[in-house]
């Protein structure tokens, strides 16, 4: 029985998903704002964001645009806070760090937040949580927000244009939901946490089956299931389970790796995936968990098949690779 009061931000107020979701979202965006700030970062998504800006203008809105210089970083957020004073909503279009920055900026300005993931690399478009990094890319902490985004637009035609590496990274990040929750929350008596753990198990099973086919064919049903599992379903578990279902060893390893300049080019999920392998080794060697050894043997071939890093080398020669 849950003895204490708890508050949950479980899901965005509205979710539009599928082919053409962005076009369908425009009337909803009109209802939320008239002068949105469109936030992005990567030069690789600049053309997509120019199109989104043109669509907003064609819909009668007056959009402003801004780019992050760093990851979700206080230096950027301070600058954007000043630049967005005339805006009445924040639209974050990009990867996880752009989405985190947009959510946190909207939270601090008390403005509506619209997330438009341009990859399936994380579930940041869904959650009421933002990770903060230093200008150098080192993880500094996370901030819990009072609500999930007001609107999440998951347009398959936009997400499909992302590099395959981002989907592989999203698979690793989503898989961590099970491997971490099964350690942190397996003995919880909280019904919501129990249900989040079981959802994480089902999600893991689906990704083990679907993700290789999804990587091979972006027009397949497996791609849709995998991309939505990574960007949407994984976020549901965070909303239901809260802190009890995240940040065990896999994400702790990620957070540590961000302190190393040599790891800054690795995507979030690539570091998390390596962290899962570390966690399973710790469970096996320090906890005597034979199931962890079996899970390691099951997971390692998949991560390799998806092209995810499975070894940590120290220059100039490798030492005790985890994989």
Model-derived features: positions:
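ATP/NTP phosphate-donor binding region
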Residues: 1-89
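Solvent-exposed alpha-helices and their adjacent loops that cap or buttress functional pockets
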Residues: 7-9, 29-31, 82-84, 106, ...
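N-terminal loops that bind phosphate or other acidic moieties
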Residues: 308
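Single conserved hydrophobic/aromatic residue that forms the stacking wall/gate
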Residues: 313-323
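Active-site segments that bind and position negatively charged phosphate/pyrophosphate groups
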Residues: 189-301
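A short, small-residue-rich loop immediately preceding and capping a beta-strand
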Residues: 84-105, 109-118
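A glycine/threonine-rich phosphate-anchoring loop and its flanking beta-alpha core
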Residues: 13, 107-199
């Amino acid at each position: 029985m849950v003895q204490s009061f708890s508050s949950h931000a479980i899901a965005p107020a509205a979710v539009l998903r599928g082919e053409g979701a962005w076009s369908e979202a425009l009337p909803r965006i009109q209802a939320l704002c008239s002068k949105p700030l469109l936030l992005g970062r990567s030069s690789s998504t600049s053309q997509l964001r120019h199109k989104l800006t043109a669509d907003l203008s064609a819909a009668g809105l007056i959009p402003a645009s801004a780019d992050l210089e760093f990851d979700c970083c206080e230096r950027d957020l301070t600058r954007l806070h000043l630049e967005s004073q005339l805006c009445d909503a924040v639209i974050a279009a990009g990867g996880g760090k752009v989405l985190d920055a947009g959510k946190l900026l909207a939270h601090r300005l008390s403005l509506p937040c619209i997330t438009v993931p341009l990859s399936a690399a994380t579930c940041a478009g869904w959650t009421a949580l933002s990770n903060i990094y230093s200008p150098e890319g080192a993880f500094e902490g996370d901030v819990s927000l009072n609500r999930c985004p007001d609107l999440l637009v998951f347009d398959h035609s936009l997400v499909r244009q992302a590099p395959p590496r981002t989907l592989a990274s999203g698979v690793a990040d989503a898989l961590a939901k099970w491997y971490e929750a099964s350690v942190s929350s397996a003995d919880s008596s909280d019904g919501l946490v129990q249900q989040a753990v079981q959802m994480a198990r089902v999600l893991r099973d689906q990704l083990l089956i679907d993700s290789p086919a999804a990587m091979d064919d972006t027009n397949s049903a497996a791609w849709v299931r995998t991309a939505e599992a990574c960007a949407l379903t994984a976020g549901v578990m965070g909303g239901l389970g809260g802190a009890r279902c995240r940040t065990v060893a896999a994400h702790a390893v990620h957070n540590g790796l961000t302190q190393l300049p040599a790891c800054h080019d690795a995507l979030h999920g690539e570091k998390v995936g390596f962290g899962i392998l570390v966690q399973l080794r710790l469970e096996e060697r320090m906890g005597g968990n034979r199931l962890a050894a079996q899970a390691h043997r099951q997971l390692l071939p998949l991560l390799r098949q998806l092209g995810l890093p499975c070894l940590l080398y120290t220059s100039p020669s490798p030492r005790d690779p985890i994989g």
